Amino acid sequence: GCCSDPRCKHQC
């Protein structure tokens, strides 16, 4: 998911 992706982790 996004929480594991550094490109969108800031959204978590």
Curated annotation (Swiss-Prot):
It is found in: Secreted. Alpha-conotoxins act on postsynaptic membranes, they bind to the nicotinic acetylcholine receptors (nAChR) and thus inhibit them. Expressed by the venom duct. Disulfide bonds join C2-C8, C3-C12. The lineage of its organism: Eukaryota, Metazoa, Spiralia, Lophotrochozoa, Mollusca. The cysteine framework is I (CC-C-C). Alpha4/3 pattern. Coiled coil: none annotated. Belongs to the conotoxin A superfamily. Keywords: Acetylcholine receptor inhibiting toxin, Amidation, Disulfide bond, Hydroxylation, Ion channel impairing toxin, Neurotoxin, Postsynaptic neurotoxin, Secreted, Toxin. The modification 4-hydroxyproline is found at P6. GO terms for cellular component: extracellular region; host cell postsynaptic membrane. One of its GO terms (molecular function) is acetylcholine receptor inhibitor activity. Occurs in 2 forms, Reg1b has a 4-hydroxyproline at Pro-6, Reg1c contains unmodified proline at Pro-6. The modification Cysteine amide is found at C12. This is Alpha-conotoxin-like Reg1b/Reg1c.
